Amino acid sequence: MSKPQARLESVTVAAVQMTSAADVASNLQSAATLLEQAAAAGARVALLPENFSFMGRRDADKRAIAERDGSGLVQDFLSRRARELGIWIVAGTTPIADTPGERVAAACLVYDDQGGRVARYDKIHLFDVDIPGRAEKYRESANIAPGSRLGLVPTPAGLLGLSVCYDMRFPELYRPMAAAGAQWFTVPAAFTVPTGRAHWETLLRARAIENLCFVVAAAQWGQHESGRETYGDSIIVDYWGTVLARLGTGQGVILADLDLQAQRLARRDFPALSHRVM
């Protein structure tokens, strides 16, 4: 169990960009190296991308490597690295096998700096889409069971609202979290290249602006063993929609300071969240 978080004025957070493969052990080694870089650079909280531990050759492969909730290679790794590095880890998504039937949950697990798991959010909006003009078809719901609960967790950077990838297209997910006091949102993702070019930055900045929240988005990037290509462009945006940091291509880490005092003043002087009438 994590301790109550002291009120801080500015907190350094990191977003990790990866090109995950179909080998869990190799992906965890890459994640370990990048998390070490984030911690060494002063991050208090680090976000891993969606599917950080496994990008299989087929979507159905998630079922074969899914872990039971509470223990397993990936979950043990996350707890250990959070404790050893002394940082919080918001761990993209991990396939968890505790849903009815054969489908798994795409679970975003959060670990505090003592290695304790403090939150779980299951991806709600599933990507069942045919990409316009491309021979790309996605049916996440064939292998993933949707979540149904919001994810809110106190962190060193304030109250965090959890989301995953396709969730970002649904502003109604974020509004109740902002109304409940969320100060920042995380968006681990594995965006397609066409939709990334068209919408990625616009959607992230919109979610930040309309809720006066920071948004931290960690992405998959590059060519994967399935033949799929992901967009990358990990990004950190402030409550005013200003891009604080980004990594377009390649694997790596970006960092930014979340100025919570400036956010409080902005919300006081521009109280749009209190002006809602619908």
Spans of features found by a protein language model:
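Residue-level recognition of beta-strand->loop/alpha-helix junctions
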Residues: 17-19, 49, 122, 219
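CN hydrolase (nitrilase-like) catalytic-core segments centered on the catalytic cysteine
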Residues: 70-90, 159, 165-254
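Cys-nucleophile CN-hydrolase/nitrilase-fold catalytic domain and related Cys-dependent amidase chemistry
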Residues: 24, 33-114, 118-122, 191-207, ...
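Beta-strand-turn-beta hairpins that frame and shape the catalytic cleft
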Residues: 4-13, 152-161, 184
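Short beta-strand scaffold segments in enzyme catalytic cores
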Residues: 91-93, 106-110, 151-153, 234-236, ...
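Active-site catalytic loop in hydrolytic enzyme cores
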Residues: 99-180, 193-202, 269-272
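A short C-terminal boundary segment appended to hydrolase-like catalytic domains
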Residues: 261-278
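N-terminal glycine-/serine-/threonine-rich phosphate-binding loop
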Residues: 1-45
